[in-house]
């Protein structure tokens, strides 16, 4: 979208806002989530809701359904309704730029959660250290499978900062431990795609020793493919620490998961939004803790 078209669209949005019957109250915070069809982002939303309730805000949540066009429409809708501040968990770090710019031109402060925006102005970004998490996952694989292990990496949605950063951290471990990377292929943070991609990769690489999946949903899909193929000796490490992921670790099925704290990301987003609305200074970036979860 060029700037002329964007300016026209924002002008139309601003005009509509004056007649909108659904204009937002001053005590409302808007949250646009990439998808609510993923336990991680449901937890993020729940954390935001809990903090909003605590601070006395009404939280309006819109689901982008992993679709950048839907994401832009959601932000347009919120702009029409006169939102005072926008929390957004991008579907794609590049594609979200138009939505961020739309909010910028309407003078709506933007805070990104979990995934960054590569374009537009953002007042604060709240996320885990995904690079460190990817490195921790790789280091754990080396500890259990050994130096030079034969590994497969299941990547998230191309273009998201989470996928890029987790991959970057894992590549640091690949270099440090001289892994033999048999394949690196996207499965879009999706369990069914993780299953299907892993089935295909197993045909070509039956000698795989370990799998790093950039989220727990893909890890659980890969685990199912390995179980079906009778490959119980292949270790799988996930990322996120979702309830399903941690249960699989405690049941001895997943070797480990890098646990994020999505509820804290959501809560910190609302807390930061509260500060912005009150005119207080906020940091450009707030890191949220993560941890390696293994069976005890």
From Swiss-Prot:
The keyword Transport applies. Residues 1-25 form the signal peptide. GO terms for biological process: D-ribose transmembrane transport; positive chemotaxis; transmembrane transport. One of its GO terms (molecular function) is monosaccharide binding. It is found in: Periplasm. Keywords: Chemotaxis, Periplasm, Signal, Sugar transport, Transport. InterPro entries: Peripla_BP_I, SBP_2_dom. Part of the ABC transporter complex RbsABC involved in ribose import. Binds ribose. Also serves as the primary chemoreceptor for chemotaxis. The complex is composed of an ATP-binding protein (RbsA), two transmembrane proteins (RbsC) and a solute-binding protein (RbsB). This is Ribose import binding protein RbsB. It comes from Escherichia coli (strain K12). The lineage of its organism: Bacteria, Pseudomonadati, Pseudomonadota, Gammaproteobacteria, Enterobacterales. The gene is rbsB.
């Amino acid at each position: 979208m060029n700037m002329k078209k964007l300016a026209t669209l924002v002008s139309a949005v601003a005009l509509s806002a004056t007649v909108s019957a659904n204009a937002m109250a001053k005590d409302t915070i808007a949250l646009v989530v990439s998808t609510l069809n993923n336990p991680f982002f449901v937890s993020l939303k729940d954390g935001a809701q809990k903090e909003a309730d605590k601070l006395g805000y009404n939280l309006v949540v819109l689901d982008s359904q992993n679709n950048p066009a839907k994401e832009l429409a959601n932000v347009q809708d919120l702009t029409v309704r006169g939102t005072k501040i926008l929390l957004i968990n991008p579907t794609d770090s590049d594609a979200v730029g138009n939505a961020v710019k739309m909010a910028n031109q309407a003078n709506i402060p933007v805070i990104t959660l979990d995934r960054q925006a590569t374009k537009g102005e953002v007042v604060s970004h709240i996320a885990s250290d995904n690079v460190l998490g990817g490195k921790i996952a790789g280091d754990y694989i080396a500890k259990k499978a050994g130096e030079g292990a034969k590994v497969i990496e299941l990547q998230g949605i191309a273009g998201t900062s989470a996928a890029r950063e987790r991959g970057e951290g894992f590549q640091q471990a690949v270099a440090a431990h001289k892994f033999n990377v048999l394949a690196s292929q996207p499965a879009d943070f999706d369990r069914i795609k993780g299953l299907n991609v892993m089935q295909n990769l197993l045909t070509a690489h039956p000698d795989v020793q370990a799998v790093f999946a950039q989220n727990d949903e893909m890890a659980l899909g890969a685990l199912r493919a390995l179980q079906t193929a009778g490959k119980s000796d292949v270790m799988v490490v996930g990322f996120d620490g979702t309830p399903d992921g941690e249960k699989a670790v405690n049941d001895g099925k997943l070797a480990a998961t890098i646990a994020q704290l999505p509820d804290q990301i959501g809560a910190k987003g609302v807390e930061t939004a509260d500060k912005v609305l009150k005119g207080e200074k906020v940091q450009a970036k707030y890191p949220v803790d993560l941890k390696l979860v293994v069976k005890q």
